[in-house]
Amino acid sequence: MSKPASGASVFISVRVAGICALLIVGSAIGCRFLGDGQTLMAALKLVTATLAVGVVPGALATMLWRPRRALTLLEVIGFGVAISFGLVHLIAVLAVSAHVGAPITLGMLAIASTLMAIRTIWRPFGLVVITLDELIVLSLLLALSVFLYNLGSPVTWWEDQVHVSIVRRLSELASPRLDNLYVTPGLVYAYPIPGTHFFMALIARLSDLDPLFVYHK
């Protein structure tokens, strides 16, 4: 599965990375059916859903694209976040233009991620390199993320509450349109394709958490 490399590095095949990606997606789906009454359980549901929507699709696309035979872990994660956000925005355009609800778009994203993972697992070439330096950086980022998670984002201002309402509507609407996203009926929102809101709506729908909690965290 993995072997030590020269220095303080470990090489992991893209096959193993693809299996890990599938496990993350499966965990996100499985955690949906767990209760969220406890703090740790709610955090687990939110984190797995965020990884499944905001990192895994782009990471799999990066490993399929494979600009180099060996990619570092931070490169896979960094490209994964950037590409995943782009994919979510394209899905948001599709959802609003074709009036497709969050459950259908989530299914499309899950199918695409599964197909990319299977293709990645079948590929015999490609490595993900984990170095000690990157593990230190990831540890610091993890510590920062825990602090920011506990701190949360303010939701007391009127503008924040409007954003939360749009996230909630995107997660619940069966037929999203330009004129039904905003809290005022028939009024077109200033951002016709709110990609960031749709990203949070997909996470809320996948994790089965309240959109207010997702926005706050």
Regions found by a protein language model. Give the residues of each.
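Membrane-embedded, hydrophobic transmembrane alpha-helices
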Residues: M1-I130
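Active-site lumenal/periplasmic loops and adjacent helix-entry segments of GT-C-fold
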Residues: D133, L140-K217
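Generic detector of bulky aromatic hydrophobic side chains
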Residues: T72, H89-V93, G101, I136-L142, ...
